[in-house]
C-alpha cells in the first residue's frame, strides 16, 4: 500500500488511507461469498523495485433480465510519466482477466477516455450520465472557496461585493428549490436496511431490461462504506405503508480549499 500511495502522491491523486483501502477488498460482497482467485490489480516496478504503475480491479455485480452478471471495475490506473508507454499493458491485463462477464470504468477523465476508446470501449448510453445538479446552501462560502482555489487574493470587502452581486443575479436559481413543499412521508436513513432490499427486488423486476448495479443493502453499504462511516452520505427515502417506494443518495461535500 505504501508504495502505491507514493505513486499516487507523485501524480497528485488522492486515495483512501490504508485501513479503508484494505477494507474495500476484504468487505467486497462478491469476494466474501466466492472462493475464487481474484487479481486485485497489476503493478509496474522499476529496477529498484519502486512501483511506477498501477491498475486496480474491483469486483462488481449488475443485473439484466433478473440474471446477475459479475464484472470488474477498473480503478486507480496511474503510471509515472517516464513509464507511460507501459500503460496499455496494464489495460490489456485488466481486460484479459477471467471469471468476469464485463469490465467497466466509472471515473474516466478525458485522457483515460482516449485510451479506452482505442480498446473499443463504449460510453454508458445515458445522455446525462456526466451532468450534476447542485443545491447551493452557502453561496458566500462557495465564492470564497472558488477564489482560494484559483489563487485569487481579494479583501473581505471585495468578496462581499462579489457575493451580493452573485446573489442578486442568480437569486431565482439559488432559491428555486425552496418553493417545493414536501407533503409525503420522507425519512432520512444513515445506512441501507431490509426495507431497501424489498424495494430493490421490486425494482429489478420492473426494470429487468435495464442493466443495473446490484442495489441490495449489502452491495450499496459496501460501495458507500467510507462515506457512511465518515458521515458524508445520507439516504432520503419516501415511504408508504411502511414500505420504501423511492429514495435518493445524497453525498455531502464541504470544500474548504
Where are these predicted regions, by residue range?
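Acyltransferase donor/substrate-recognition loop-hinge adjacent to the catalytic core
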Residues: 122-210
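A generic secondary-structure signal
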Residues: 93-97, 171, 223-226
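A broadly tuned preference for mixed-charge, low-complexity surface segments
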Residues: 50-57, 97-110, 127-131, 154-169
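A conserved beta-strand-loop-helix scaffold within acyl/acetyltransferase catalytic domains
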Residues: 1-77, 184-257
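Acyl-donor binding region in acyl/amide transferases
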Residues: 63-144, 251-257
Amino acid at each position: 500500500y505504501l508504495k502505491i500511495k507514493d505513486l499516487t502522491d507523485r501524480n497528485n491523486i488522492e486515495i483512501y488511507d490504508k485501513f479503508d483501502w484494505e477494507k474495500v477488498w476484504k468487505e467486497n460482497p462478491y469476494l466474501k461469498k466466492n472462493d475464487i482467485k481474484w487479481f486485485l490489480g497489476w503493478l509496474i516496478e522499476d529496477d529498484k523495485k519502486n512501483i511506477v504503475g498501477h491498475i486496480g480491479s474491483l469486483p462488481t455485480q449488475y443485473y439484466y433480465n433478473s440474471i446477475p452478471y459479475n464484472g470488474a471495475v477498473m480503478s486507480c490506473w496511474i503510471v509515472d510519466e517516464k513509464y507511460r508507454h507501459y500503460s496499455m499493458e496494464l489495460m490489456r491485463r485488466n481486460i484479459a482477466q477471467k471469471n468476469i462477464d464485463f469490465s467497466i470504468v466509472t471515473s474516466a477523465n478525458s485522457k483515460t477516455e482516449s485510451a479506452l476508446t482505442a480498446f473499443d470501449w463504449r460510453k454508458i448510453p445515458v445522455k446525462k450520465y456526466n451532468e450534476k445538479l447542485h443545491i447551493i446552501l452557502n453561496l458566500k462560502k462557495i465564492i470564497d472557496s472558488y477564489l482560494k482555489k484559483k489563487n485569487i487574493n481579494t479583501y473581505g470587502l471585495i468578496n462581499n461585493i462579489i457575493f451580493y452581486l452573485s446573489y442578486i443575479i442568480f437569486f431565482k436559481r439559488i432559491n428555486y428549490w425552496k418553493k417545493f413543499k414536501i407533503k409525503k412521508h420522507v425519512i432520512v436513513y444513515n445506512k441501507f436496511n431490509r426495507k431497501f432490499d424489498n424495494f430493490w427486488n421490486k425494482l429489478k423486476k420492473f426494470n429487468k431490461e435495464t442493466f443495473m448495479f446490484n442495489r441490495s443493502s449489502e452491495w450499496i453499504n459496501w460501495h458507500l462504506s467510507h462515506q457512511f462511516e465518515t458521515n458524508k452520505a445520507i439516504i432520503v427515502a419516501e415511504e408508504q405503508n411502511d414500505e420504501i417506494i423511492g429514495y435518493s443518495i445524497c453525498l455531502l461535500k464541504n470544500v474548504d480549499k
